[in-house]
Amino acid sequence: MKIRQICMVVLLWLGVIPAVQAQSFDKLWKEVEQAGKKSLPKTVIKLTDEIYRKGEKEKNSAQMLKAYMWRMKYQEIVTPDSFYVGLTGLEQWAKQTKQPMDRAILHSLIAGIYADYACLLYTSDAAD
C-alpha cells in the first residue's frame, strides 16, 4: 500500500514539473512580447538571453532556438552590423550540438538565412 502511495506521489510530481517549467517560459515570453510592443529592444535582448540560459539549463532546444532568433532580430535593431555575429553563433551551435535533430534544424535555418541574404543581394543588384 505504501509503495502504491509513493508511486502516485512520484508520478504526480513528475507531471507537475513540466507544467511549472512551461508556465515559467510562457511568463517570460509574455514579458518579451510586451517589451517588443513597447519598442524596448534592449529589454527584449536581456529577456531572451535569460530564456536561452534557462532553456540551455533545462535542455529545451526549442526554447533556446526561439530565444536565439528573437535575440538576433532585436540585436540587429540595436547594432545593425551584428547580423554576422548572430549567424556565426548559429553555425557554432550547429557544430557543437550532439543532437542530430537539433543539428538538422540549425543547418536548415542557416541555409534559409543564407538563401534570403543571397536573394536580397540579387534583387538589389538587379535594381541597380
Task: For the regions a language model picked out, list residue spans one by one.
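Conserved positions within tetratricopeptide repeat
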Residues: 45, 65, 84, 104-105
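Bacterial Sec-dependent N-terminal signal peptides
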Residues: 1-28
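Conserved small/polar residues in nucleotide/adenosyl-binding loops
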Residues: 122-128
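Residue position in alpha-helical solenoids
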Residues: 54, 93-96
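Helix-turn-helix repeat elements of alpha-solenoid scaffolds
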Residues: 39-49, 79-89
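Non-membrane alpha-helical segments in proteins
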Residues: 29-37, 51-53, 62-77, 108-116
